[in-house]
Amino acid sequence: MKKLVLSLMSVLTLIIPFFTNAITTHAASYSELAAHWAPQIYQDVNADLDVRADFITNFNYDGDYLALNNWDNLLNYNENAYVYYKVSETLTHYFIEYDLFHARDDAYTRPLDAHENDFEGLFLVIRKDGSTYGTFQLMETMAHNQWYDYTNDPSITSGSDNVDGGVLFNGSHPKVFCQANGQSPSGGHGVKAYDGSSAPGGDGIVYDYTGTAQFPTNTSGSYTNHYGYALIEWGDLWNRRNDPNIFSSWGTIAGNNHTANSANAPWGWDDSDDGPALQGMNWSDPAHQVDVHLNGLGNFSHTYVVNPYFSHKIVLQNVQSLEDRDPFGGKSDVYIKAYVNGQGQTDARFWKKNDAPKNQIFNIAFGANDAEFGPNFSENYNTVYVAKPSNTNVEIHVYDSDGTSGDDDMGYLSAVVAPGTTKTWTDALTSNGQAKVSAVVSAQ
C-alpha cells in the first residue's frame, strides 16, 4: 500500500482525551463502552445523486428485511440515523466496531460503481488500563476494501499496513469522515479519519451520538447542521446472516440496482494487500488483524474474554514431516494451510519450517521459525478465529513450500465441525500419509 503517513509533529498536535487519572467506579458494559467511544461522523453529501442516499440509517429503515427494495424506497421512508456496533474483548483490549449503512452506493458512472445497499465502517482498539472506559490506542477504517490505520501513539509503527495519520477527538468521540456518493471513483461512503477540513463541495452534515435517531432536514453548509444517531448492536443482522432475503451469498448483501450483489457485510470485507489478515478478520479476529497491520503495540493479548462473532476457532498445535518432498530428496519446507468452506485461513506467512527433518515434531507459533511474514507478532499464539458458514467443511492441509515451482501437497485432515462441537486431531496422519498434525477446531 502506498498511503501518506503524517509526520510525527502532526500526530503530536492532534487532540486525544486522557483518562490516566480516571477513578474506576465500575466496569463499563459493552453498550456503555460503545456509547462512550461512539464516533462523531462528518458525512459529506451530494445532492446531484439524491442527498438522502448519503444519510446513514438501519438496514430495515423501510420497515422490512428485504434487501431488494432499499434503493427504491429511499424517498418513501425517513432514513433515521443509526450505527451498527459490536464489541470483542481480549485480556488487554476492547475492539469496538462501528458500521455505517447507506441504502444506495451511487456514482456518476452508473452502472459502474453504483449498487444497492452499502456498508463501510471502522473499529477502535481500546487498551484496558483499569479505568472505566480504557484508553484509546488506535483506529482502523474501511473504505472500499482498503484498510486505513490511525493512531496518536508515536510508538506504534507500520506493519503490513502503513500508519496513515492521527485521530482528532470531540471529547471521547473520534472524528471520522464519510465520503458522499460520487466523491470517489471506487464508490461512496468510504470512512477515514476526519482531518479538520471543510466539506467537499461545501455541503455536509455531522452525526453525533445522542441515543436518538434523527432524520436530517437541512444539509446546507459545511458541517453546520448536527443530527443525533442511535446505536444498534449487530446481533440483529448477524442472526439473519443466512437469510436469502438479505444476502445473495455468504457475507454479500443482495442488490439488483445497477451492479448487482455488490455490497459486503463486515464479515465479507477483504483488503487484498494487507498481509496475512484475511477476509473478515476485522469481524472474527480483530486482535490478529491489528497485530498484522501494525507494530509497537506493547502488551497485546490474543486471548479473548468475549468474542461472539466467529464461526470457527482453529488452533494449530504441531506438525511433523514424514517425507522429504523437496527436489532431489531435500527436506520438506512445511507449512499448514487451514481451509473453511474452501477458503484458506492460514498459510506460509503465519508459520513455516524450512528443511524440516522427518519424524521431528515442530510446535507452531505464528511468526516463528521461517514464517514468511517474519517475527512481527506481539506474542506467541497459534489460533485464528474465522467467520464462515456453519456446518461447512474444515480441512487442515500440510504443504511443502517450493516457491515458484508449485507447493507439494503432503495430505490433509478433514471434518465438518457442527456448531457447539469440537474436533481434535492428535498426531493425526494426513490423507496421503506424508505428515502428522495436531490441531483443534471448535465451532459456535
Language-model features, listed with the residues they occupy:
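Generic short beta-strand segments
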Residues: 97-107, 315-322, 398-401
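Calcium-regulated, polybasic anionic-phospholipid
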Residues: 316-363
